[in-house]
Each structure stands twice: as C-alpha cells, then as structure tokens.
C-alpha cells in the first residue's frame, strides 16, 4: 500500500452531449453537429464513389439555436456526431426585469436560469400573452449544454 493520497475531481455523470452515427444513415429532418454546433438537417445529397475514395454525403443544416445555415461534406462510411436534442414544456410563471423567465417544472420546482427568446415574434407573443394574464406553456429545446425557448402555446385565461 502506498502512502500517497489520491484526489479525484467529481463532475457530471459523464453523459455525452453527442452520440456517433454513420454519415450515410443521417437523413433529412435528423440532427448533426457541424463546426461544433447542433443542427437540424434540411438537405442531404450523396455522391457516388469515385476512382479514389469513398462515397460522400453533403449535408446542409440549420443551427437549431441561431438559425444559421451550415454545410459539411463527410465520407458516407465515417461517423458523425449527432447531438442529444431534448424538448421540454414548462409553464410560464413570471418575466423578470433583467431578461430572464421563471418557469414551473413538472415536479413543482422553478427554473429561473433561462433568458427571454431572441426571436422578436416569439418575444412579442410571450410578453403580450403574459400581460393579458393568459396561462402560457413554453417549449424549451436543449442540446450540447445550451437551452433556448423555441415555441409557446396559450392554455387559456387564468
């Protein structure tokens, strides 16, 4: 036995933000990581195998948070990172002065770390509905450590 003390840093549970998937199996409507950003695939085209090398997949995708268009070309036999994308609905409790929202989770606790959406139409709809006293349920999309409000629906007046 040694007299050395070992210290291990504790961190998250080790759940990966992405999982591998073969490029040839990623379809339109699926998700992919391009340039480190989680994206939704809007177009896939495959080129045939040439004299040298593999068949290639050309992906055109939209960043799910910024809506920017990104493209990538990957050999169809290679693995690509696919983000774990989750969408959760929360009930809106309050909109704070500093640009954050207070949301009610399924288990009754509150979530106060989410900023107001950057999408102007969604922001206007959210503020107007809240001021009118309507019950609003917001959909929050999360992937790769980022979260953003992506949709809302009115459940009716209080």
Swiss-Prot record:
GO cellular component: cytosol; mitochondrion
One BP annotation, GO: positive regulation of translational elongation
Keywords: Hypusine, Initiation factor, Phosphoprotein, Protein biosynthesis
Region listing for Disordered, in residue ranges: 1-23
Phenotype upon loss of function: No visible phenotype, but presence of extra root protoxylem cell files.
SMART domains in UniProt: eIF-5a
GO molecular function per UniProt: ribosome binding; RNA binding; translation elongation factor activity; translation initiation factor activity
Name by which UniProt lists this protein: Eukaryotic translation initiation factor 5A-3
Organism: Arabidopsis thaliana (Mouse-ear cress)
Expression (tissue specificity): Expressed in the vascular tissues of roots, stems and leaves. Localized in phloem companion cells rather than sieve-tube members. Not expressed in xylem or procambium. Detected in root tips and in the chalazal tissue of fertilized ovules.
Record carries keyword Phosphoprotein: yes
PANTHER family linked to this entry: TRANSLATION INITIATION FACTOR 5A FAMILY MEMBER
Similarity comment text for this entry: Belongs to the eIF-5A family.
Induction, as annotated: Up-regulated at post-transcriptional level by iron deficiency.
InterPro entries: IF5A-like, IF5A-like_N, NA-bd_OB-fold, Rib_uL2_dom2, Trans_elong_IF5A_hypusine_site, Transl_elong_IF5A_C, Translation_prot_SH3-like_sf
Residues bearing the modification Hypusine: 51
Residues with the Phosphoserine modification: 2
Keyword Lyase annotated: no
Role played: Translation factor that promotes translation elongation and termination, particularly upon ribosome stalling at specific amino acid sequence contexts. Binds between the exit (E) and peptidyl (P) site of the ribosome and promotes rescue of stalled ribosome: specifically required for efficient translation of polyproline-containing peptides as well as other motifs that stall the ribosome. Acts as a ribosome quality control (RQC) cofactor by joining the RQC complex to facilitate peptidyl transfer during CAT tailing step.
Pfam family, one: IF5A-like_N
């Amino acid at each position: 036995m040694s007299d050395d003390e070992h210290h291990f840093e504790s961190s998250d549970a080790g759940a990966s933000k992405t999982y591998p998937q073969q490029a040839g199996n990623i379809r339109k409507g699926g998700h992919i990581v391009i340039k480190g950003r989680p994206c939704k695939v809007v177009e896939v085209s495959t080129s045939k195998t040439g004299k040298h090398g593999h068949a290639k997949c050309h992906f055109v995708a939209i960043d799910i948070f910024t809506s920017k268009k990104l493209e990538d070309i990957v050999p169809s036999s290679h693995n690509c990172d696919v983000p774990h994308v989750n969408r959760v609905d929360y009930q809106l409790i309050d909109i704070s002065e500093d640009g954050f929202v207070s949301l009610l989770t399924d288990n009754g606790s509150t979530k106060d770390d989410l900023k107001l959406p950057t999408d102007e139409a969604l922001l206007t709809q959210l503020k107007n509905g809240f001021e009118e006293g309507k019950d609003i349920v917001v959909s929050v999309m999360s992937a790769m450590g980022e979260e953003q409000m992506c949709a809302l629906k009115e459940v009716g007046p209080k």
